[in-house]
Amino acid sequence: MSQEILDQVRRRRTFAIISHPDAGKTTLTEKLLLFSGAIQSAGTVKGKKTGKFATSDWMEIEKQRGISVASSVMQFDYKDHTVNLLDTPGHQDFSEDTYRVLTAVDSALMVIDAAKGVEAQTIKLLNVCRLRDTPIVTFMNKYDREVRDSLELLDEVENILKIRCAPVTWPIGMGKNFKGVYHILNDEIYLFEAGGERLPHEFDIIKGIDNPELEQRFPLEIQQLRDEIELVQAASNEFNLDEFLAGELTPVFFGSAINNFGIQEILNSLIDWAPAPKPRDATVRMVEPDEPKFSGFIFKIQANMDPKHRDRIAFLRVCSGKFERGMKMKHLRINREIAASSVVTFMSHDRELVEEAYAGDIIGIPNHGNIQIGDSFSEGEQLAFTGIPFFAPELFRSVRIKNPLKIKQLQKGLQQLGEEGAVQVFKPMSGADLILGAVGVLQFEVVTSRLANEYGVEAVFDSASIWSARWVSCDDKKKLAEFEKANAGNLAIDAGGNLAYLAPNRVNLGLTQERWPDIVFHETREHSVKL
């Protein structure tokens, strides 16, 4: 183990931002970059008319709608650390891509709209984080507006999300009367002023909750704050680092992302408390981040990040060792060595060539169709990293095209979008139409839009009479062949070459499972494992 690798791993922080749609996640992403000095002017999401688009929302459909559809990756330096920030799609229809992003991070920042509290998508995403005991930092956003009672919000997080809260800052007022926050651990008051262009050193700080200056500034609010702090300290949890790292307790911060307020405290907490890259499970052994040899896995494939180049980029999370440009690395699923000379790092759509990368870093490998989600890379050791699943889709459409001469483009487009994980593609064993499976309706809209923009294909989706899909496998090849023959009308092959049973309804699935007890029906499948 080299000291250089160990030092670099300790400097890394890799986290994702998770939230329900419209809680202010993309704005917060922008502001974190602004505070770190990575960008000069944050393009807030709402001002679509101004033509200032958020750094992290780059695909055409995102620009039109103001929602993050593809998860973006941004790297920046802050306080002698290298931060890898993964922005995830907040829209509820994108739970699959979001889930996969959460397999590549070591901690998460949960953004809650304080006017609304805990919402459906937040619950889903937190459950995904819980599968891996991911440490969570919480930001209660939008205190410059009228919001719900702060104690009530903490109760809701604890009761619904089943994670204990430890307030680190506490709001003074809200909406028009929002005066700032009190930092409980530092015994400091940060005074709020509206305006999105302010940087951290431009906010006033008053030392001590008993400072007489506070009575002069806002006598009513300060008394209320003192009463609330007494109550909070009696009723809620103190911050405990070990409990945070175990995913059992979340430090809570309050503020207003659009006004740059409360951002620096979050950044500091992620640097000071969030974990450096952790060991990773592979099929043969546990891989430590400070091992000398390079390894990593693909958690996402993005087609056409640059409309000028019809390219695809595979996003790789480095798990161990040191990546150096030009080094030889092995693509383990197809047992092929590649020379990594044109690997890139990201600031959303701005790409730079990578000279070196360490555990926790996200690098982009140009993909000409050989790389799939879940693939592992190493310097030669047969490591297959685990824990990157596909979910059985819940919605299905059959797809046809208006111009039959473009069938090749359609097939190519769907093959690429299927590998990228934008949608699941099934080719029925009988019948010519391809079937698309998704977790939410918006995914179909994205596919329609991308087929038109990127592949020049006008596709029409028709509803398909399918209730759910299950991947099927059986150790007994003879039994599997009998099953295939008897159920040919309901079987299809997915983009990864796996056999799937498309059930028209719940009853049919139940009866088929009873009739064929030797066949295993899977609700999820590992990306890197062929069933």
Curated annotation (Swiss-Prot):
The residues that hold GTP are 19-26, 87-91, 141-144
Entry-linked CDD domains: RF3, RF3_II, RF3_III
The reply to whether Cytoplasm figures as a keyword in the UniProt entry is yes
**Keyword tags:** Cytoplasm, GTP-binding, Nucleotide-binding, Protein biosynthesis
Q: Name one GO cellular component term.
A: cytosol
Domain tr-type G, chain residue ranges per copy: 10-278
The protein's superkingdom reads: Bacteria
Where does this protein reside within or beyond the cell?
A: Cytoplasm
Q: Pfam families attached here?
A: EF-G_D2 (PF22042), GTP_EFTU (PF00009), RF3_C (PF16658)
Q: Which GO terms describe its biological process?
A: regulation of translational termination; translational termination
Q: Which GO terms of the molecular function aspect are on file?
A: GTP binding; GTPase activity; translation release factor activity, codon nonspecific; translation release factor activity, codon specific
Q: Return the similarity comment.
A: Belongs to the TRAFAC class translation factor GTPase superfamily. Classic translation factor GTPase family. PrfC subfamily.
PANTHER family membership? PEPTIDE CHAIN RELEASE FACTOR RF3
Any idea what job this protein has? Increases the formation of ribosomal termination complexes and stimulates activities of RF-1 and RF-2. It binds guanine nucleotides and has strong preference for UGA stop codons. It may interact directly with the ribosome. The stimulation of RF-1 and RF-2 is significantly reduced by GTP and GDP, but not by GMP.
Q: What is this protein called?
A: Peptide chain release factor 3
> What organism is listed for this UniProt entry?
Neisseria meningitidis serogroup B (strain ATCC BAA-335 / MC58)
Q: What is the lineage of its organism?
A: Bacteria, Pseudomonadati, Pseudomonadota, Betaproteobacteria, Neisseriales
- Which gene underlies this protein? prfC
